[in-house]
Structures are given as structure tokens and as C-alpha cells.
């Protein structure tokens, strides 16, 4: 009798426990059955857990996959990015050698300056050397730029172009041939420029242009073309102005004398040493032509 009562009590307790656990269990797929909950994300743990996910179609990825054409360079085709980091914070692209792309060449050049006896060198662009280098460049621009006079070879170039279009050899070309002459010399004037030029010639020059007028018209264009271009020939000519003894190198005394002539005042010995220290890459205390070119193109 006692054993029968114990079995009944155990069954009763099991039924009560099952009822208690079943009453607290959430209905499965409630979001799919209830129309009011469709399209809403259920709060709770990770949506990938099968115990808490609703309809599999209602799952949302943690990060929107990036289209193929917007993906990061080097990522596998068709796969989303690993995380949603903004594109601006991505590290810069690197080449095969491991160096970052897009670095200015001047950084590597300036970083290659050697250590000097008086301590670390003043990097390019320091206050010690810059004022004088900034004064030297306008001097060369005035010698080879737009505010200079035409050189003999440039005047000869204009003369040859003028002769080619002076068909009757009377020393004049008409305004209609001036546009073709300009195109022959490599200039491409617009129609508006040609109209204005023709009006100027017809009003002031009687419709014809002699050689002096031609030089006055074309000279500024020729100078403007070469204003920002200092070629090897011009740089060698400028280097010879500094290298007075012709040994192929500019010494401290030669640089000081050349700067005195160009700037119109004497430059101190210490300032000259700072300039040479700033541009002397091989450390011999003198400036050769290659270093001079680097100095003027910086």
C-alpha cells in the first residue's frame, strides 16, 4: 500500500513539473504566426541562434554586404567585408615592397641627407637656408622667365616664322595669315583671340604687321611659354655663373660671390655654409651640378 502511494506521488510531482515548465515556454515561431510582429526584429540573443530566431526569412545580417564594385581592393569577389569600418579609416595601400603608395618623393630625398659633424643637419626648408634659396629662385626666373628679354635664338625663331608667311617679301604679313603663323609656331589661338587680334591690327597697324610689330605681339607668348620651364641648358648656364673657375663645382667662396651679385648685398659666411649644408648630398662641402639642379627644383 505504501509503495502504491509513493508511485502516485512521484507521478503527480512529475506532472506538476511538466506543467510548470510547459506554461513558461514561449510559443514557437510566434513572430511568423502573428501578423503584427512580421518584419520586426525580436529582442534577445544573437539572431543566428535557432532557439530565439523567428522565421529564417526575417533574419538580418549584422553588416550590409558591400557590392562588388564598392568592396575593398584585394577582398575576395562576392564576399562581404569582415566588418563595417568606414573606408576613410582603412590603412593606406602598400606596394609589393611594403612602402606606402603616394608618398611625396621629397620626403625620401630629404630623409636621405647624411648626418654632419656639427650634429643633425637642418632639413630642407629650415629657416637657416630657406630665405636665401627663396631669393635665388626668383633671380633665375627673372633670368629665364617671362620678365626677361628675348634671347637671340628666340628672336631668330620669330624671324623665320615671319619670313615663311611674308609671301610677297615686302616685310609685312596680313592679319589673316597671323593665325596660321601662330599655329605653325605651336600656339593654338581661339577664334575669339583671333578676332580681337585682327581688330587690334586693323585699327592700329592698318591691317598689316611688320616684323617689329610681330615680335611685340608674339614675344610675350613665347616668354610665357618658357616662364615656368628651366631646361638643362638654362640650368647649366646658371651653374656656370656660380662656378667661376670652371672646375664643375661651386665652392663656398663662389656661392658667396654669386649671391652677392644676384642679391645685391653680402651674405655671411655662416649663411653660405648653411645653404651648402642643406643641398650638399654627398658631404664633400661643395655643390656639383646634380646637387644644384636638386636645389633649384625643390
Swiss-Prot record:
Tissue-level expression: Somatodendritic compartment of neurons. Restricted expression in retina to a subpopulation of amacrine, bipolar, and ganglion cells. According to PubMed:11906216, expression is heterogeneous within brain regions and their major cell types and does not match with those of marker proteins for characterized neuronal subpopulations. Isoform 2: Minor isoform expressed in the brain, in the granule cell layer of the cerebellum, at low level. Not developmentally regulated. Isoform 3: Minor isoform expressed in the brain, in the granule cell layer. of the cerebellum, at low level.
Biased composition (Low complexity): 11-25
Biased composition (Basic and acidic residues): 1-10
Keywords per UniProt: Calcium, Cytoplasm, Cytoskeleton, Developmental protein, Metal-binding, Phosphoprotein, Repeat, Sensory transduction, Vision
Phosphoserine sites (modified residues): 251
A Pfam family reported for this protein in Swiss-Prot or TrEMBL: EF-hand_7
SS bonds (residue pairs): none
Residues noted as binding Ca(2+) 1 in the record, renumbered to the chain: 166, 168, 170, 172, 177
Gene Ontology molecular function: any one: identical protein binding
Subunit structure: Interacts with ITPR1, ITPR2 and ITPR3. The strength of this interaction inversely correlates with calcium concentration. Interacts with CACNA1A (via C-terminal CDB motif) in the pre- and postsynaptic membranes. Interacts with CACNA1C. Interacts with CACNA1D. Interacts (via EF-hands 1 and 2) at microtubules with MAP1LC3B. Interacts (via EF-hands 1 and 2) with NSMF (via the central NLS-containing motif region), the interaction occurs in a calcium dependent manner after synaptic NMDA receptor stimulation and prevents nuclear import of NSMF. Interacts with MYO1C and TRPC5. Interacts with SPACA9.
Described purpose of this protein according to its UniProt entry: Modulates calcium-dependent activity of inositol 1,4,5-triphosphate receptors (ITPRs). Inhibits agonist-induced intracellular calcium signaling. Enhances inactivation and does not support calcium-dependent facilitation of voltage-dependent P/Q-type calcium channels. Causes calcium-dependent facilitation and inhibits inactivation of L-type calcium channels by binding to the same sites as calmodulin in the C-terminal domain of CACNA1C, but has an opposite effect on channel function. Suppresses the calcium-dependent inactivation of CACNA1D. Inhibits TRPC5 channels.
Protein name: Calcium-binding protein 1
Annotated source species: Rattus norvegicus (Rat)
Designated gene of the protein: Cabp1
Amino acid at each position: 500500500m505504501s509503495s502504491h502511494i509513493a508511485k502516485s506521488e512521484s507521478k503527480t510531482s512529475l506532472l506538476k513539473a511538466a506543467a510548470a515548465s510547459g506554461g513558461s515556454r514561449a510559443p514557437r515561431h510566434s513572430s511568423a504566426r502573428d501578423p503584427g510582429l512580421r518584419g520586426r526584429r525580436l529582442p534577445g540573443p544573437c539572431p543566428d541562434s535557432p532557439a530565439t530566431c523567428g522565421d529564417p526569412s526575417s533574419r538580418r545580417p549584422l553588416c550590409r554586404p558591400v557590392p562588388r564594385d564598392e568592396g575593398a581592393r584585394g577582398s575576395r569577389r562576392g564576399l562581404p567585408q569582415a566588418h563595417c569600418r568606414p573606408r576613410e579609416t582603412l590603412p593606406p595601400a602598400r606596394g609589393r615592397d611594403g612602402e606606402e603608395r603616394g608618398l611625396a618623393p621629397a620626403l625620401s630625398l630629404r630623409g636621405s641627407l647624411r648626418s654632419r659633424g656639427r650634429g643633425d643637419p637642418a632639413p630642407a626648408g629650415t629657416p637657416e637656408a630657406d630665405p636665401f634659396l627663396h631669393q635665388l629662385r626668383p633671380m633665375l626666373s627673372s633670368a629665364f622667365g617671362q620678365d626677361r628679354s628675348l634671347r637671340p635664338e628666340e628672336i631668330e625663331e620669330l624671324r623665320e616664322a615671319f619670313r615663311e608667311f611674308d609671301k610677297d617679301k615686302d616685310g609685312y604679313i596680313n592679319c589673316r595669315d597671323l593665325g596660321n603663323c601662330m599655329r605653325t609656331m605651336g600656339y593654338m589661338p581661339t577664334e575669339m583671340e583671333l578676332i580681337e587680334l585682327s581688330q587690334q591690327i586693323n585699327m592700329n597697324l592698318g591691317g598689316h604687321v611688320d616684323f617689329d610689330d610681330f615680335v611685340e605681339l608674339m614675344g610675350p607668348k613665347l616668354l610665357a611659354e618658357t616662364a615656368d620651364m628651366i631646361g638643362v641648358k638654362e640650368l647649366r648656364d646658371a651653374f656656370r655663373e656660380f662656378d667661376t673657375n670652371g672646375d664643375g663645382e661651386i665652392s663656398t667662396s663662389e656661392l658667396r660671390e654669386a649671391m652677392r651679385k644676384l642679391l645685391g648685398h653680402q651674405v655671411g659666411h655662416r649663411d653660405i655654409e648653411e645653404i651648402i649644408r642643406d643641398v650638399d648630398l654627398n658631404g664633400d662641402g661643395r655643390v656639383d651640378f646634380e646637387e644644384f639642379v636638386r636645389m633649384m627644383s625643390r
